[in-house]
Amino acid sequence: MGPGTSEAQILDAAKRCCERWGVAKVTIDDIATASGVSRATLYRLFPGGKDVLFSALQVRELTEFFDRLTAEAAGVDDFEDLVVRLIVTATRELRADEHLAIMLGSEPGEVLGQLTVEGLPRTIRVATEYLTPLVRPYLTENESTMAIDLLVRLTISYFLAPSDTIDLGDPVSARQFIQPGLAALACARIT
């Protein structure tokens, strides 16, 4: 491994290779060449090869996403405002993600699987880890977990199948959409 070469540089190279050739076609050799490391170095850093490397890339992307999301929501002191901020920011981040757009265009089946069936449990786990401290002041632990699960599924669903009438990237539209659900939750907690 050359001076300054790191796991991050290899993950960056993997991301570029995926954008260029698609997940199914990219090889360890492609990633090693793009990152300037040998196959041996790549395997030493990512034992298990391509699957382990792609898993590390997904974890990094999720971590960066939720770092940005929690930074945007920091300081919000009202539950409704928090939910709106989380939904709007997440929707805007997903829409602005060029890598995601490229991958959806070139390998929609693979990406849909990672956003839904295969990758959704991981996304919900990471979301719960990051968002619970923000949501917990307003809800019980169990309610927080369920609310985060719902928010993740809702946001991904509307990202993948946008509505003609609801824009979750718009604060006013998102607020109008979630208010009835939050009102029902508040009533259920009172009774």
Label every model-predicted segment.
Residues 10-18, 61, 65, 90:
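Short hydrophobic clusters on alpha-helical segments that form packing/core surfaces
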Residues 1-21, 25-34:
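Basic, helix-initiating cap at the start of DNA-binding domains
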Residues 85, 91-120:
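Amphipathic alpha-helical segments used for helix-helix packing
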Residues 20-23, 43-54:
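HTH DNA-binding helix-turn interface
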Residues 40:
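Key DNA-contact positions within bacterial/archaeal DNA-binding proteins
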Residues 66, 111-149:
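Amphipathic alpha-helical packing segments from all-alpha helical-bundle domains
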Residues 92-96, 151-168, 181-190:
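Amphipathic C-terminal alpha-helical segment
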Residues 56, 70-96, 148:
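Hydrophobic alpha-helical connector segments
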